[in-house]
Amino acid sequence: DKLMEMFSSGIKLRWLNNAGFEMILPGGAHLLVDPWLDEAQIEPFPLVKLERADYVLLTHTHIDHAQSIGRIQKKFPGAAIFVGDLSAEELCREYDLNVERLFRVRSGEVFEFDDLKIEAIAARHTESKGGNYWNRGYCIAEDGKRKAIEFYGSLEMLNYRITASDGTRIVIWGGMTTQ
């Protein structure tokens, strides 16, 4: 079982799989970042084990970051979902999302709520070791919808800076290396 870890700042963090995390901030806000759950091929995390989601942040829309989003919204219909502006329409179509809780995000935008602030930062998908980039949009299955959503996942990517109600800051920074 994947346990929630508590840090001295009061933040609770649980790795879900791949790039996915569940985070509980000191003020109580529950965030999911790139949650790939039951569908994951390695170490799936059951959606049924998630008790709450107030905010869902997608760095990009490759399936290993976004495939669970439709099921998450069905379980937590009030959750605010943040996704790149170019990817939003295809994401809604692919996973039949309620657009009222979807935030189309561009780099530099800031979203302020009572319990946190979310800032979007431009990012770039990293290459794997050896220089291979396995997630290119044109390498995806021939399903037109999937091809489009994967293409946008390769086209735009976001990092996020979260400021909790107590002033604690967290940076969501994607990539396979710290270089």
For each of these PLM feature ranges, what is it?
Residues 5-12, 25-31, 110-119, 163-170:
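Beta-strand-turn-beta hairpins that frame and shape the catalytic cleft
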Residues 18-20, 108, 155-159:
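Short hydrophobic/aromatic beta-strand or adjacent loop that forms the aromatic wall/cage
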Residues 3, 22-62, 67-75, 128-146, ...:
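Pre-active-site segment of Zn-dependent metallo-hydrolases
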Residues 13-17, 151-154:
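A short catalytic or substrate-binding loop motif that flags glycine-/basic-rich loops and adjacent residues
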Residues 12-15, 30-34, 80-84, 101, ...:
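Short, hydrophobic beta-strand segments that form beta-sheet elements in well-ordered domains
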Residues 147-179:
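Metallo-beta-lactamase
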Residues 45-111, 116-131:
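Active-site HxH/HxHxD metal-binding segment of metal-dependent hydrolases
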Residues 1-6, 19:
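A short, compositionally biased domain-edge/stem linker segment
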